[in-house]
Every structure is written in C-alpha cells, then in structure tokens.
Amino acid sequence: MILYISSKQFGYQTDFLKNWIMKNNNRILLIANALDAKDEMKIKNNIENDKKILNEIGFEVTVVDLKDYFNNQEKLTKDFALYNAYCVIGGNVFVLRQAMKLSGFDNYLKKISKEENYLYIGYSAGSCVLGNELGTFNKVDEPISFYLKDNVIYEGLGLINYTVIPHYKSDYHKVHLIDDLVKRCIDEDIKFKTLKDGEVIIENIEKDNEV
C-alpha cells in the first residue's frame, strides 16, 4: 500500500496521485470522521472543499461515515473492498482513532497494508494516526472520548515507524504548539518527521521504503 502523507490537504505532489490513477483507477472513499466533534457547517465545508480538489486531481469521490460501521467490521470490509483508495482528512486525531477502532477500519488497513495497488491519502490528523503512538499530540488535540465514555486511544496504527508532525513552521493557528511537540519528541527520543504545509511524504509500505 502507498501512503501519501501530507500536512495540509494534498500538498505539492498531486502529479503522483494523477499517475496512480492512470495505473489503477480513480474511485476513492473520503473519510472525515476526524471532524466529528466540529460543527456541521465546518464539516460540510471541509468535505466539499476536499471533494472539489480530489475531483480536480481526477478522483471520483464517495464520502463515507465510519459511524455507519461501528461494531460491524464485516460490513466495512465488504463495502471498502470495492475501493482501493482511501482519503482520511484532518481534524482531531483522537476522535479519528476512536472511529477507526469502533468501525474496524484500523484492522482493515493493517490487513491490506502489505498488498499492492492500495492507496491511503492522509493529511493532518489523517497522517498523524499512522505512527505508533498518539500521546505526544495531547497538547495539540484534546484527547476527548467522543463516541464512548473512557475511550481515548493513545496507540496509533503502527503503519510507519515514526511520528508525523504536520504544520511545521507553517501558517497554522497552533504553530507554537507544533514547536513544543517537536521539542517533546526530541526530549523523549521519539522518532519523528516534520512536514510543512504543502510538503508530502510518500511511503510504499508494501516494499518498506520511502518513494
């Protein structure tokens, strides 16, 4: 599986995505559950904006809500198997992680991670969730238990062996907290990579190397 890891939206390497579409297909699921704790207007606006950009890249976008699959991973596996591209957008990384767990999307991603011809696009929270641990983000995102009581999850998906720190040295309203996060990773000897808005890391985890 290819991981297209971005800081803000889809970054400066969208030609890579266009080439991927040519070699595979253009159908993609858009997952916005990281925004579930936000107001409805913000959720709607963010989804529409991201759909527009993905359409311009060449994708045919279907929006899916992980809440529809809570406690029904069998249905998620069946429905998601019709696609081999998934886009997970930003918001609160702890809310996103809970939605992934309750729906079984986390296990689904791990299952297909070593298979060819799959694409995961993640930005902001959608990229942060890919690492091993999420505890370092508790000063940037509030670790709220959104869907169930006492359900905060501090373990990431573990699809990469480093922590992604987005919005580094960028025009971001919490940029001062990002600097603190970098310092914390250094102090606690946590492996990390920073991304400025616009920058992208592309990982081929089927081959265990960065593209």
Located regions from the model:
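N-terminal beta1-alpha1 cap of cysteine-dependent amidohydrolase-like domains
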Residues: 1-85, 89
